[in-house]
């Protein structure tokens, strides 16, 4: 009798799970899900991008998957992306609440940063504040250029010391990108062996791999394992470590800042807290500031450094493209001390190369997950409120018919017949719409100034004993090239870049 009772409840449990995994009426098609696991077995845990493409070919540009018991819609192609992220932006601007990347924050989920915050008045207020603060601290202006050029000086010192050797540029580019955003956020740069830089960069690298790895997928698919001491708990510890480091910086700023005379992003936020006083409730608060800063630091470090790694991998293995870039740089800059971001308008080929690097790097291939804020429609399908939305940016950046050479590295993708720089509408490495990456303009300025300055002074060479280059990326929240080494030589013309 007891055994029959248990079996009955097991059957009821699985029946309920099967009902939860049924697609709503007029929902996008997709592969049949399994109870508990959903479509987890339809995706490679190491790199699901190939599976997303395989499913797109079978089910079309709008199809559905189940992440455990939760329905998700994968959107592909320029037409679908524009309808969702631009035409119906408000309907698709939410953030899912019950997933690993949201839960691994060590503080209340209502006090997260800006990237994972749901679409709300608080999110709008913080995004507006960040954009205004970045503008005030020189984003797009000469003062920001000087910060970037100053950091490049340290990168060039590293390269000069490495002449005649074979070395990995990974840490060098990560540290440079991290220091540039640190100057905006904290008003200071760090030596490359500083504990803050070393720990934060390492924590973010580990969390990037965990968040898009098998354990995060299992966390989302099988809720009953969430309290077990499994490998995903490492991400929780990493965020707690970073939170303590930023808390210490906030304490230092409180002791040294002059109210009303902000020197960096932290000062601006603390001034805003003073201005609002106790009337603001939880919209602006120190806990939110901690996660806000970590969001901005991660977004400003990982994507830029991985794009640089991808860029120099291609430039080394396409030496004719590297040489043509250098010829254009020499012609435009002549005897000037350093490049300016405004020089991009006179460097169409360099612009094309940088954008092609971004297209091939595709550093955030699934963007950050969205969810619908209302019952809505997409390409004729009905999507209930709260539906998880996954953008397959790879489908746009390599879409047939949108690019001259969709599957190969070729700057001609961004040049017209007259050799002028053009940007196709399918170029969406930062997604599109109101939740597009906050640091897009900073990233573009960094990429241009760093690549132009380094190419002006150095020749980058693929080592003879390195074998054939492998362009296959390592999958995580951000894509990164497989580790590689480079050699550098000084070019014939020598130029200095004053800080």
Can you name each region flagged by the protein language model?
Residues 1-23:
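Terminal signal-anchor or tail-anchor transmembrane helices
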Residues 24-43, 50-144, 168, 173-183, ...:
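Cytochrome P450 substrate-recognition site 1
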Residues 27-30, 74-84, 91-93, 187-192, ...:
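Classical protein tyrosine phosphatase
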Residues 40-60, 244, 338-380, 387, ...:
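Conserved cytochrome P450 K-helix E-x-x-R motif and the immediately C-terminal K′/meander segment
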Residues 95-106, 121, 141-308:
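Cytochrome P450 heme-thiolate monooxygenase catalytic core
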Residues 319-321, 440-478:
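Cytochrome P450 heme-binding "Cys pocket" and the immediately downstream C-terminal segment
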Residues 379, 417-447, 472-474:
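Cytochrome P450 heme-thiolate "Cys pocket" and heme-binding signature region
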Residues 391-419:
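Conserved cytochrome P450 K-helix/beta-meander segment immediately N-terminal to the heme-binding cysteine loop
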